[in-house]
UniProtKB/Swiss-Prot annotation:
One of its GO terms (biological process) is protein repair. This is Peptide methionine sulfoxide reductase MsrB. It holds the Pfam family SelR. GO terms for molecular function: peptide-methionine (R)-S-oxide reductase activity; zinc ion binding. The active site is at C119. Residues 8-130 form the MsrB domain.
Length: 132
């Protein structure tokens, strides 16, 4: 997968204010406020910045957290995980594997088969519904 590296000013021109704040500055939307937290439409969730496929609706579940939650990404290259020591705690940040957009965090309290909960901001996603 070819990487995308753009200056912040380019991203600022292409994204909404909320998308820029979350994806490029590492922000977080309020729980239960995002477009996709309760969506059950079958399809694939892509990065809002670069269009890379990130999560399939087959891996989406209701974690009760108020953010879209998935037990796995579409493949091992779709996302990358980084240590995050902000806010006085240790978490694992999830970023787009192609453009490095901040997506959310992953926690070890998810369902089978992975036991993981990818807790993702709706503003970092674009749902492409499955046809048929």
């Amino acid at each position: 997968m070819s990487k995308i590296d753009k200056p912040l000013d380019s991203w600022r021109e292409e994204l909404t204010e909320e998308q820029f704040h979350i994806c490029r500055l590492g922000g977080t939307e309020r729980a239960f406020s995002g477009e996709y937290h309760a969506t059950k439409t079958p399809g694939v969730y892509h990065c809002t910045c670069c269009g890379t496929a990130l999560f399939d609706s087959d891996a989406k579940y209701d974690s009760g957290s108020g953010w879209p939650s998935y037990f796995q990404p579409v493949d091992g290259e779709a996302v990358r995980e980084l240590d995050d020591f902000s806010h006085g705690m240790h978490r694992i940040e999830v970023r787009c594997g192609r453009c490095d957009a901040h997506l959310g965090h992953v926690f070890p309290d998810g369902p089978r088969p992975t036991g993981l909960r990818y807790c993702i901001n709706s503003a970092s996603l674009k749902l492409v519904p499955r046809e048929g």
